[in-house]
UniProtKB/Swiss-Prot annotation:
GO terms for cellular component: cytoplasm. GO terms for biological process: L-histidine biosynthetic process. The keyword Nuclease does not apply. It catalyses: 1-(5-phospho-beta-D-ribosyl)-ATP + H2O = 1-(5-phospho-beta-D-ribosyl)-5'-AMP + diphosphate + H(+); 1-(5-phospho-beta-D-ribosyl)-5'-AMP + H2O = 1-(5-phospho-beta-D-ribosyl)-5-[(5-phospho-beta-D-ribosylamino)methylideneamino]imidazole-4-carboxamide. The keyword tRNA processing does not apply. Its main location: cytoplasm. This is Histidine biosynthesis bifunctional protein HisIE. In the N-terminal section; belongs to the PRA-CH family. It is an enzyme of class 3 (hydrolase). GO terms for molecular function: ATP binding; phosphoribosyl-AMP cyclohydrolase activity; phosphoribosyl-ATP diphosphatase activity. It comes from Wolinella succinogenes (strain ATCC 29543 / DSM 1740 / CCUG 13145 / JCM 31913 / LMG 7466 / NCTC 11488 / FDC 602W) (Vibrio succinogenes). Residues 128-229 are annotated as: Phosphoribosyl-ATP pyrophosphohydrolase. Residues 1-127 are annotated as: Phosphoribosyl-AMP cyclohydrolase. Keywords: Amino-acid biosynthesis, ATP-binding, Cytoplasm, Histidine biosynthesis, Hydrolase, Multifunctional enzyme, Nucleotide-binding.
Length: 229
């Protein structure tokens, strides 16, 4: 470990604020928090990792959206209790789709205005990760507390049956229905598929990795490779 970082008193400051700045432009992108594990992961991978106070876990920036932050330099302030990361931002930093989380400008007359920068909707793909972790939180909950908790309590057979039902409804919608109805049914199918993944403890990132593996591989070759194995 870098001797400078050894000077951090983690017992006194278990979570350090981390200011994230874009390399080159100097624009401040976001503020997050790091514990010791997150900082060690950031150093070892050269990609920003943080500690989510709401989820109570380590998360890699861009783990769902792909909007990772490649580390170029790390600085500590004079009291060794605040971190500054200078990064190369892939895509956007803010979950709203904007480049920076600091897009609400407070005018000197105390009024609040928004910058005109339009959000990049590709950042919304992070909703899958958020939904997955919300589903995990429903496991073991009172079955009467929510539809999802009731599904979990009934087990894999009921979950599997619902996935089949939703797939059929999407198929019929694609054949006969409007775009809005197709989107609605596709969302239902994805939701129930995520319930199934959560039931088995499989993170959606594994599906993304599998899809990425298949890129550039013909469907016929991919199916044949499964038969061979």
């Amino acid at each position: 470990m870098n001797t400078l970082l050894d000077g951090i008193d983690w017992e006194k400051h278990p979570l350090l604020p981390a200011i994230v700045q874009e390399r080159g432009s100097g624009e401040v992108l976001m503020l997050a928090y790091m514990n010791q594990e997150a900082l060690n992961l950031t150093l070892s991978t050269q990609v920003a990792h943080y500690f989510s106070r709401s989820k109570g876990r380590i998360w890699k920036k861009g783990e769902s959206s792909g909007h990772i932050q490649k580390i170029h330099e790390i600085f500590l302030d004079c009291d060794s209790d605040t971190i500054l990361l200078q990064v190369e931002q892939v895509g956007v930093a803010c979950h709203t789709g904007r480049k920076s989380c600091f897009f609400q400008k407070v005018e000197l007359d105390s009024s609040l205005s928004l910058t005109s920068e339009a959000p990049d909707t590709s950042a919304l793909y992070g909703v899958v990760d958020r939904l997955y972790h919300e589903l995990l939180a429903r496991q073991g909950a009172d079955p009467q507390s929510s539809y999802t908790a009731k599904l979990f309590s009934k087990g894999e057979n009921t979950i599997g049956k619902k996935i089949v039902e939703e797939a059929a409804e999407l198929s019929f919608a694609i054949k006969d229905s409007s775009e809005s109805e197709i989107v609605y049914e596709a969302a239902d199918l994805l939701y129930h598929a995520l319930v199934g993944l959560a039931f088995r403890g499989i993170h959606p990132d594994k599906i993304k990795q599998e899809l990425q593996r298949r890129q550039g591989v013909s469907g016929i070759a991919e199916k044949n490779s499964r038969k061979d194995s």
